[in-house]
């Protein structure tokens, strides 16, 4: 697979979108791969493979249109409960895609990050992740965050334990604990919170994703299944986003 895309009708930012009001950070819950495959009498793994192509195009689209960061919810802590052959396929797919796409990501200026408990992943995948993060660390065109073995509740517990350890060691006064400090101990420490959270397939839940980070994100749900979420669908999501008034709890 190559990140180089075919000529596209929506390469430039559509004229009806205000560049100054684009979300800085878009996060996506990529749902519907299995249903997409089932509708076509294909194995579920074909839906996941098509979903990779969709994600690559969305990453390129965000870069083309001037969005600073894209986060993809790739694998949750709960996804280990799926059938073993599917889990094994996904781990292999992640590794293959990283290995094949790294050169293009470097050339395209993509800075890749992984958030989640990576220690549970296969050692070979961990090695590819480390290599990709190191190789793209100085890139500045777009941040690409991949949530892998990620769970929002587990992340918060991890942050609490990290802070508690510093307090116990006498390195931190409990009175100094605030939102800024807490955020530094999250997997996403140093990354901006999402402005827009997109969920495909029509499900009305956030599935234990970014429980802290989406506190003030605008949420957009589409019935489009993830493999069918193209630039036109993303355009519609951004149009909807720009019609909203973000109040952040104020009047």
Curated annotation (Swiss-Prot):
Coiled coil: none
Molecular function as annotated in GO: ditrans,polycis-polyprenyl diphosphate synthase [(2E,6E)-farnesyl diphosphate specific] activity; magnesium ion binding
CDD domains reported for this sequence: Cis_IPPS
Enzyme Commission number(s): 2.5.1.-
Positions with a binding annotation for substrate: 32-36, 44, 48, 76-78, 80, 82, 199, 205-207
Residue sites binding Mg(2+) per the record: 31, 218
Required cofactor names: Mg(2+)
A GO BP annotation: polyprenol biosynthetic process
One Pfam family this sequence matches: Prenyltransf
Keyword field: Magnesium, Metal-binding, Transferase
UniProt-listed SUPFAM superfamilies: Undecaprenyl diphosphate synthase
Magnesium among keywords: yes
PROSITE patterns: UPP_SYNTHASE
Active site: 31, 79 (proton acceptor)
Cofactor note: Binds 2 magnesium ions per subunit.
Oligomeric and partner information: Homodimer.
UniProt-listed NCBIfam families: PRK14830.1, PRK14831.1, uppS
Family of the protein in this entry: Belongs to the UPP synthase family.
Function of the protein: Catalyzes the condensation of isopentenyl diphosphate (IPP) with allylic pyrophosphates generating different type of terpenoids.
PANTHER family xref list: DEHYDRODOLICHYL DIPHOSPHATE SYNTHASE 2 (PTHR10291:SF0), DEHYDRODOLICHYL DIPHOSPHATE SYNTHASE FAMILY MEMBER (PTHR10291)
HAMAP family hit by this protein: ISPT (MF_01139)
Protein name: Isoprenyl transferase
Gene that specifies this protein: uppS
